[in-house]
């Protein structure tokens, strides 16, 4: 089994780290550069830095914060938010990022995945997917014909891809989109459950497992981490390659090292 990764996530709004629940009710969690330094020292494998309002507000990503973070951090840094072109990729990589995460722009312009992977390499291109369960009320609905249906404790559902920071549904089935981004040249998928986001009730394991089993790409599970057992579940039941978390680290409920120790106890390889 390959070494599993623990990745703190820094959601940035107006230059500050914020955290919310189900993509709303945002509250301040600190300075991105200072938090990055802390997680670097705690043994994080990577960091994900997302400017969560950039795509929606049509605002360029904050290059200055990326530069200052990259100067302090010596682990891989993935940066996303408002990145629409190959030139945007180039600017962020020059600022110090190792990988670029795209979501809205990938859906709107799928060729960007192909173009960026050809220029910068597949390892640079992370496709972020914000996904929400769509419960089925009418099994005869014509719109369900091309959807992958899953049974959950709360009923049958399919998984819909959302864009603009979770504000707009696309009607796209998450399983089919994952297959397409793999075909187009993405190197990794950052998979966020909008239903689980910020709840601390655990990752959406049905979703994570479904995407993991339908693509060969590494999957970063995101949304819902409340304790170390949730991370273990993401790796075992969800078959994820990495686990992303925010609240439990930002509010000092545990450290990266605490999480890794618990994961290792379950015979899952991690890097210390």
Curated annotation (Swiss-Prot):
Its EC number is 4.3.2.10. It is found in: Cytoplasm. Signal peptide: none annotated. Pathway: Amino-acid biosynthesis; L-histidine biosynthesis; L-histidine from 5-phospho-alpha-D-ribose 1-diphosphate: step 5/9. GO terms for biological process: L-histidine biosynthetic process. The active site is at residues 11, 130. GO terms for cellular component: cytoplasm. The keyword RNA-binding does not apply. InterPro entries: Aldolase_TIM (IPR013785), His_biosynth (IPR006062), HisF (IPR004651), IGPS_HisA/HisF (IPR050064), RibuloseP-bd_barrel (IPR011060). GO terms for molecular function: imidazoleglycerol-phosphate synthase activity; lyase activity. It catalyses: 5-[(5-phospho-1-deoxy-D-ribulos-1-ylimino)methylamino]-1-(5-phospho-beta-D-ribosyl)imidazole-4-carboxamide + L-glutamine = D-erythro-1-(imidazol-4-yl)glycerol 3-phosphate + 5-amino-1-(5-phospho-beta-D-ribosyl)imidazole-4-carboxamide + L-glutamate + H(+). SUPFAM superfamilies: Ribulose-phoshate binding barrel (SSF51366). Pfam families: His_biosynth (PF00977). Keywords: Amino-acid biosynthesis, Cytoplasm, Histidine biosynthesis, Lyase. It is an enzyme of class 4 (lyase). NCBIfam families: hisF. IGPS catalyzes the conversion of PRFAR and glutamine to IGP, AICAR and glutamate. The HisF subunit catalyzes the cyclization activity that produces IGP and AICAR from PRFAR using the ammonia provided by the HisH subunit. Belongs to the HisA/HisF family. Heterodimer of HisH and HisF. This is Imidazole glycerol phosphate synthase subunit HisF. It comes from Methanococcus maripaludis (strain DSM 14266 / JCM 13030 / NBRC 101832 / S2 / LL).
């Amino acid at each position: 089994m390959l070494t599993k990764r623990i990745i703190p996530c820094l959601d940035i709004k107006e230059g500050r780290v914020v955290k919310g629940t189900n993509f709303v009710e945002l509250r301040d969690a600190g300075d991105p550069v200072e938090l990055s330094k802390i997680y670097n020292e705690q043994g994080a494998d990577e960091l994900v830095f997302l400017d969560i309002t950039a795509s929606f507000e049509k605002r360029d990503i904050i290059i200055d914060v990326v530069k200052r973070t990259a100067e302090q951090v010596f682990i891989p840094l993935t940066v996303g938010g408002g990145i629409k072109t190959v030139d945007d990729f180039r600017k962020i990589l020059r600022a110090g990022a190792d990988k670029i995460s795209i979501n809205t722009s990938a859906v709107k312009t799928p060729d960007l995945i192909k173009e960026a992977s050809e220029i910068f390499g597949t390892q640079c291109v992370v496709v972020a997917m914000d996904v929400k369960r769509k419960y089925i009320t009418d099994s005869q609905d014509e719109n369900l014909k091309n959807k992958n249906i899953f049974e959950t404790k709360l009923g049958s559902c399919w998984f819909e891809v959302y864009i603009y920071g979770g504000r707009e549904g696309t009607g796209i089935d998450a399983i089919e989109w994952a297959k397409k981004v793999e075909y187009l040249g993405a190197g990794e998928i950052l998979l966020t459950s909008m239903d689980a986001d910020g709840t601390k009730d655990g990752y959406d394991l049905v979703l994570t497992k479904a995407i993991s089993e339908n693509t060969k790409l590494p999957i970063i599970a995101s949304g819902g981490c409340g304790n170390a057992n949730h991370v273990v579940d993401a790796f075992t039941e969800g078959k994820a390659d990495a686990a992303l978390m925010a609240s439990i680290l930002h509010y000092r409920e545990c450290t990266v090292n605490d999480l890794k120790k618990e994961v290792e106890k379950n015979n899952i390889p991690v890097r210390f």
